[in-house]
Structure formats: C-alpha cells, structure tokens
Regions:
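Phosphate-handling active-site elements
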Residues: 78-89, 115-132, 136
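Short, charged, solvent-exposed linker or helix-capping segments at domain edges/interfaces
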Residues: 53-55, 102, 180-186
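N-terminal beta-alpha supersecondary unit
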Residues: 2-86
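ATP-dependent small-molecule kinase catalytic core of the GHMP/sugar-kinase superfamily
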Residues: 2-31, 122-188
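Short pre-catalytic strand/loop immediately N-terminal to key active-site residues, enriched for Gly-Thr
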Residues: 88-100
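Broad, structure-driven detector of short, well-ordered beta-strand segments within folded domains
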Residues: 42-44, 89-92, 149-152
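DPxDG-like acidic metal-binding loop motif
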Residues: 70, 100-130, 142
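Short clusters of hydrophobic/aromatic residues that line enzyme substrate/ligand-binding pockets
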Residues: 29, 55, 62-63, 98, ...
Length: 188
C-alpha cells in the first residue's frame, strides 16, 4: 500500500475568448490562464492489488461515481497504458468552489493523471501526457504544466508566458449560485 497527499490548485482566466463550435462539439478558445494559490487536497492510496477506483469527497454535491472526472482520468489512463486496473482510493477535500470557472475538477484530473504516470514509472513524457489529458477535458492539459500560459485551440495549444502580475486578487463566489462549464459553453 502506498499513500500520497497532493494539492491540486485552481486557475484563473485572464481573459477568455470563445469561438465557434467544431464538429466534435468542442469550442476553439483563446485565453491566458494562470495558476493560483487555492487548492483542493487529495489523499490517494494505491493498494497494490487489482481493483477499481473509489472516491470520497468532503463536498456532498460532488458526485463520487462515474460522473466524477477522476473516474474518467482513471479509466483513460489504464485503457491507454494497457495496464491492469489497480485498486485506488481517493479522498477529495474540496476548497476550490465548484461551478466557479476556476478549473477545480480539471485540476484534480490533471494532478491525478500526473501522479498515476509517476507511480507507474513515467510511461508518458510531458507532451504525451498533455495529449492524454486532452481526452479527459479541455482544461486538463493546462494543469500538466501548471504555469501561466496562453491556451488556444480546444485547450490543446499551450504556450508558456511570463506572468508579470504582482497584485493580489480577491475571488468572490456566491454560495448557492454557480454555472457549470459545460452549460456555459453550450450557450455559445
């Protein structure tokens, strides 16, 4: 049994342009994304035996079944790597508010994917990991590098840039109000 504690940080969009929807259902975007110091905490246990993924979450509004992006990450990693599924448990302590455009789920997925890759001997290099991340979600590749970047295409074109912002930011998210990323993009 191997235990890990990882912190998956949020991101902000410093401007976001959303363009036409492609035939595959994804929109092209152009955005500047920057990581921020607000993180979820994940306690992850690898049991060194065959099995499945079990997710628990401090936020009861977050699904812990196949609808959770961590399941998609787990499934895609094992399918693509051709490794047998191992029993893994994740306890997700949420601090990043959901439905706030801060990339909480994508961050969880990106950091979990990086840990899976490391745990199984760095099967993928960074570029391959970004391509795998794109199969999970369009914000997930950003969290592979997790540095300020201009993100374009469908989220798959990531160009690191210098972050000269020195000011602090204040984020305000109403408690009982949010917009899912999927719903926001469907309005375009």
């Amino acid at each position: 049994m191997n235990k890990y504690k990882i912190f998956s940080n949020a991101k902000i969009n410093i401007g976001l342009n959303v363009f036409q929807k492609e035939d595959d259902g994804y929109h092209n975007i152009d955005s500047i994304m920057a990581p921020i110091d607000l993180s979820d905490e994940m306690d992850i246990i690898f049991y060194s035996e065959l099995g499945d993924l079990k997710i628990e979450c401090s936020d009861k509004n977050i699904p812990t079944d196949e609808r959770n992006i961590l399941y998609k990450t787990y499934k895609i990693f094992f399918e693509e790597s051709k490794k047998e599924k191992e029993k893994i448990s994740v306890f997700l302590k949420k601090s990043i508010p959901s439905e706030a455009g801060l990339g909480g789920g994508s961050s969880n997925a990106g950091f979990f994917l990086k840990l899976l890759n490391k745990y199984y001997g760095n099967i993928y290099n960074e570029k391959e990991l970004e391509e795998l991340a794109m199969k999970i979600g369009s914000d997930v590749p950003f969290f592979i590098k997790n540095k300020t970047a201009r993100v374009s295409g469908k989220g798959n074109k990531i160009e690191l840039i210098e972050n000269n912002l020195k000011d602090s930011i204040i984020l305000i998210k109403p408690i009982n109000f949010g917009v899912s990323t999927k719903e926001a993009y469907e309005s375009f």
